[in-house]
């Protein structure tokens, strides 16, 4: 049997700030819940009062609306779906239901894949950054300063920033996956112990019955006769 040190077992299920992966997943789910709830409140207030968040074409540097009603409804539906997924992950980690964490884990994989595609696009088409910056409205903060930066340096800075984000997101994915494996393994070990205890109870007879049967089956030894 392989012996595992207590500190090794602890750090194998620990994440940032030395907390358990289950605790980290709960905190991550709550954090995503707060963010999506704030976004939902902003979208609902914008839907209730469109003039407050309305931007004209001159302000945006183009002939298009900032967000119409159809896009607003789609964004609200996505926010509601994200709140449901985050709530499922938080509840699943708290109540130790591994299946409830899967939707949140799939969302993390999808988000990581999108950011990876953005990094690949920046790397393959570096001129697309300059084109995107030119399409920004003139009132955008630091637009002229960003345009004056060397394109190669700008690409390197953006790639470094995206790389840091991808590293952090990958770490969060590993934490959630470790929490899923921990809950799955714990539930499996509980079932295994339960089945083993029942088998032991059924297979082993009571001690009194075993000694009684053994005592009746044994015959006394023959008497000793001296030569």
UniProtKB/Swiss-Prot annotation:
It comes from the Eukaryota. Residues 205-222 are annotated as: Required for NEDD4 interaction. Its main location: membrane. Undergoes proteolytic cleavage following delivery to the lysosomes. It is found in: Endomembrane system; Late endosome membrane; Cell membrane; Cell projection. InterPro entries: LAPTM4/5 (IPR004687), LAPTM_transporter (IPR051115). Keywords: Cell membrane, Cell projection, Endosome, Lysosome, Membrane, Transmembrane, Transmembrane helix, Transport, Ubl conjugation. GO terms for biological process: endosome organization; endosome transport via multivesicular body sorting pathway; negative regulation of lysosomal protein catabolic process; negative regulation of transforming growth factor beta1 production; regulation of lysosomal membrane permeability; regulation of lysosome organization. It is a multi-pass membrane protein. The chain crosses the membrane at residues 26-46, 72-92, 100-120, 153-173. GO terms for cellular component: cell projection; early endosome; endosome; late endosome membrane; lysosomal membrane; lysosome; multivesicular body membrane; multivesicular body, internal vesicle. GO terms for molecular function: ceramide binding; kinase binding; phosphatidylinositol bisphosphate binding; ubiquitin protein ligase binding. Required for optimal lysosomal function. Blocks EGF-stimulated EGFR intraluminal sorting and degradation. Conversely by binding with the phosphatidylinositol 4,5-bisphosphate, regulates its PIP5K1C interaction, inhibits HGS ubiquitination and relieves LAPTM4B inhibition of EGFR degradation. Recruits SLC3A2 and SLC7A5 (the Leu transporter) to the lysosome, promoting entry of leucine and other essential amino acid (EAA) into the lysosome, stimulating activation of proton-transporting vacuolar (V)-ATPase protein pump (V-ATPase) and hence mTORC1 activation. Homooligomer; upon reaching the lysosomes. Interacts with MCOLN1. Interacts with NEDD4; may play a role in the lysosomal sorting of LAPTM4B; enhances HGS association with NEDD4; mediates inhibition of EGFR degradation. Interacts with PIP5K1C; promotes SNX5 association with LAPTM4B; kinase activity of PIP5K1C is required; interaction is regulated by phosphatidylinositol 4,5-bisphosphate generated by PIP5K1C. Interacts with HGS; promotes HGS ubiquitination. Interacts with SNX5. Belongs to the LAPTM4/LAPTM5 transporter family. This is Lysosomal-associated transmembrane protein 4B. The lineage of its organism: Eukaryota, Metazoa, Chordata, Craniata, Vertebrata.
